[in-house]
């Protein structure tokens, strides 16, 4: 059960359960840049995606609003993403982290997605309220690495496919009630690396508001 403060025509608090979680990958609009990045990752052993974009189904039990995320081993990292939630008849927008096991990623991306929880924030915006200026929304993240807080990601959603296009490519005209979809991310500044703390933000510069969430990453030992 997740609890959200929903900002629409009025502010309401809702307790929600979900029965489907989709993680959309390779959602950028620039296909040439995507192909270049796919080739770069292939050189370090990350398998080529079966399609672009690609949609991974992962366990809905991974959705969490925790402030502490336990992970197995030192090779995981977060990445900020806009997240769609279908609640009742409406679609809502939140912020989340597609935390991923990077070591497992070389064996299979779907496996790497499944191994880590997916933290999400506690506030949502009605998607209809931001649909008209989706391209101007900005995602950011900060990572605490070796005790230093650094800007880890930053980019406008205009470089990513719109939700309507993602849903069409997924094979649906709308997100089914009870489903959530991570919509993709932007590159990591300085490269992907693990962090002890991950802060994420979705900014709406038009309506002058922000969604945010932060969590600590606790690394559990790998015991043979």
Regions found by a protein language model. Give the residues of each.
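Catalytic-core "active-site belt" of small-molecule-metabolizing enzymes
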Residues: 1-176, 180, 187-224
């Amino acid at each position: 059960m997740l609890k959200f403060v929903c900002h629409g025509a009025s502010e309401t608090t809702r307790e929600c359960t979900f029965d489907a979680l989709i993680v959309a990958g390779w959602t950028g609009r620039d296909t040439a840049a995507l192909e270049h990045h796919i080739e770069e990752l292939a050189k370090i052993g990350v398998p080529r995606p079966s399609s672009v974009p690609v949609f991974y189904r992962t366990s809905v039990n991974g959705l969490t609003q925790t402030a502490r995320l336990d992970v197995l081993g030192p090779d995981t990292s977060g990445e900020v993403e806009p997240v769609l939630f279908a609640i009742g008849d409406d679609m809502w927008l939140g912020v989340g982290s597609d935390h991923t096991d990077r070591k497992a990623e070389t064996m299979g991306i779907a496996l790497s997605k499944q191994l880590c929880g997916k933290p999400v924030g506690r506030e949502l915006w009605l998607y209809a309220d931001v649909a008209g200026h989706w391209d101007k929304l900005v995602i950011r993240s900060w990572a605490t690495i070796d005790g230093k807080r650094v800007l880890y990601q930053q980019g406008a959603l205009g470089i990513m496919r719109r939700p309507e296009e993602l849903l069409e490519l997924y094979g649906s005209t709308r997100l089914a009630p009870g489903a959530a979809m991570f919509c993709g991310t932007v590159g990591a500044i300085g490269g992907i690396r693990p962090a002890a703390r991950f802060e994420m933000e979705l900014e709406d510069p038009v309506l002058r508001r922000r969604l945010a969430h932060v969590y600590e990453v606790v690394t559990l030992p790998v015991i043979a």
